[in-house]
Amino acid sequence: MAEGSFNNPQIVPIRGIGQCDAMLEPILLFIVAAFLLAGFVKGVIGLGLPTVSVGLLAIAMPPSRAIAIVIVPAIITNIWQTFVGPYLRDIVRRLWPLMAGTAIGAWLNAGMLTGPYARYGTIFLGFLLMIYAAVGLRQFVLTVAPRHEKWVGGIVGVVTGMISAATGVQVIPSMPFMQAIGMEKDELVQALGVFFTVATVALAFNLSTAGLLDQTTALPGVIAMACSFAGMAIGQRVRTRMKPEVFRRWFLIAMIFLGVYLAGAAIYKLYAPA
């Protein structure tokens, strides 16, 4: 199969102004589609950009490469979400143990993307997507008393950081925790932006240290960021014409199927006889 195909994904640099054929590389077209869809999901339900994009890109490349492409769009969109609302000071006061724990957890598990267990990353990602979707579909109602927020948040943060360092996904168990402490809808949306900004910056530090952020991710990163904002704009417009809960349900069901495919294909590839 030709270079740049899904079985051997490589980012081919643009060599000159008139040479637009590199833009038509299948992997770049796949990145465009993945981030348009991920941005659309974020525009409709307010989250899901890294989860969807990493999950889709993992079909065509190792999770470490997928995360390196996702990192810049994730940081930019989360910074934007951080400052949309008046709750920033209260969010930092309540969630600093969660954010500090996430940074520590990401640092503790920094070697997962490049170490001897990196080959299991796609399997772990697949199972994590299934868990994330199942929790969302069941809509578990959990509560954490205010007096326990700090220490529970710290533990949840460490676990989230370790999972993030291995898969790039930061919603488990951080999001159920933020829902459990009783944040209102608008405050929760802004809190997700604040938390994901910190978590993504911590992950970016891991990627940079491991040498995964280099010039080969520059072009895909720019394309991904543009497509993310385009998808978000479309999703925000569509949100007024559809029921977000109905869309969210079908989105989570699709995440289960994606998780099954990723985990199943990776296990087969890892253990199938030569």
PLM feature segments, named:
Residues 90-93, 115-129, 139, 241, ...:
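Loop-to-transmembrane alpha-helix entry segments
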Residues 32, 71, 125-129, 133, ...:
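Residues within membrane-spanning alpha-helices of integral membrane proteins
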Residues 69-118, 201-246:
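Selective hydrophobic functional segments
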Residues 91-101, 122-126, 147-157, 187-194, ...:
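Cytoplasmic-side transmembrane-helix entry/capping segments in multi-pass membrane proteins
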Residues 59-64, 85-92, 179-187, 210-214:
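Juxtamembrane helix-boundary/capping and inter-helix hinge elements in multi-pass membrane proteins
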Residues 27-28, 57-75, 119-129, 158-168, ...:
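Structural signature of hydrophobic alpha-helical transmembrane segments
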Residues 78-86, 110, 124-149, 236-237, ...:
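Transmembrane helix exit motif
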Residues 18-60, 142-192, 199:
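Selected transmembrane alpha-helices and immediately adjacent juxtamembrane segments
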